[in-house]
Regions:
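Gly/Ala-rich beta-loop-alpha elbow adjacent to hydrolase catalytic centers
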Residues: 83-92
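Active-site nucleophile elbow and catalytic-triad environment of alpha/beta-hydrolase enzymes
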Residues: 158-177
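Serine-hydrolase catalytic-loop signature spanning alpha/beta hydrolases and amidase-signature enzymes
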Residues: 18-26, 38
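Flexible "cap/lid" loop of the alpha/beta hydrolase fold
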Residues: 97-98, 102-103, 107-142, 202-203
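Active-site glycine-rich loops that stabilize anionic/oxyanionic intermediates
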Residues: 16-19, 86
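Conserved alpha/beta-hydrolase
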Residues: 28-52
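Conserved loop-alpha-helix segment in the C-terminal half of the alpha/beta-hydrolase fold
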Residues: 193-222, 234-242
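Active-site loop/oxyanion-hole signature of alpha/beta-hydrolase fold enzymes
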Residues: 43-81, 97, 121-126
Length: 247
């Protein structure tokens, strides 16, 4: 069988807390795009083999994303699509702030843009260098595990890397309103899109920034917080469609 490759912008896939490039393996199997122009990346601080990983910062993560954009040849004439899951929204919001012209479209996967001044865990004790993946019972209180088998959860536990403390404590400082003009796809999984928009209009801290976006598409993909494992084929289709959009 011959696989048809879709023409699209370059694509960068960035998973959230505790995850690396490996989290996108199932999606990549279904993403019929040019593999030379599609990169699943591991953010600094989430490489288990990095002896300095607990000291990595948001600045390190932003620099790494910009480096991948450069390697893909992203430019104002040929910008890339960035797919950001969950807690990857901090560094990706900063990338949109500093180089919006390099981004064709941002796809937030059960995630969204952060507001300036926000931090994921500002009260994290100074003596805590990193935050390991919590127990599944606690994790389920924080995010939906719907659609994840025992096998998938075991793999998550085995491969998860503790999140570096500096990344969790640092506030995200944004100054460039041009970030809001980047075309955006909001993939709503654990909370329906209509509810997300209502929360945004009500000024909910987690979603308020959504109301400032100039070009927004909302896609409902009902499942848990990790759709790259529970609905990889469907998520791949959403990503492929977003990357191929011309406006």
């Amino acid at each position: 069988m011959t696989t048809t490759t879709t023409t699209s912008s370059p694509i960068i896939l960035i998973a959230g807390h505790w995850l690396g490039a490996w989290a996108w393996e199932d999606v990549l199997d279904h993403l019929a795009t040019d593999r030379s122009r599609t990169v699943a990346m591991t953010l600094p601080g989430l490489d288990a083999d990095d002896p300095e990983r607990a000291t990595r910062t948001l600045e390190d993560q932003v620099a790494a994303v910009l480096d991948v954009l450069a390697r893909l040849g992203a430019s104002a004439e040929e910008p890339a699509t960035i797919v950001a899951h969950s807690g990857a929204n901090g560094p990706v919001s900063l990338v949109l702030d500093c180089r919006p012209e390099l981004v064709h479209r941002v796809v937030w996967v059960d995630s969204g843009p952060v507001a300036t001044g926000s931090a994921f865990a500002p009260d994290l004790p100074d003596g805590l260098e990193e935050l390991p993946l919590p127990s599944l019972d606690l994790l389920a209180q924080q995010a939906s595990l719907d659609g994840l088998s025992a096998e998938v959860l075991a793999r998550f536990r085995a491969r998860a890397v503790p999140e570096p403390g500096p990344v969790l404590r640092q506030p995200v400082v944004l100054t460039n309103d041009a970030r809001r003009s980047v075309p955006t796809t909001l993939v709503c999984c654990s909370i329906p899109g209509a509810q997300v928009l209502e929360l945004a209009r009500d000024g909910h801290a987690m979603f308020a920034e959504v109301t400032t976006l100039e070009h927004l598409d909302v896609v409902d993909l009902p499942t848990g917080h990790w759709p790259m494992w529970s609905r990889p084929r469907d998520l791949a289709e959403v990503i492929r469609s977003a990357a191929a959009r011309t406006s």
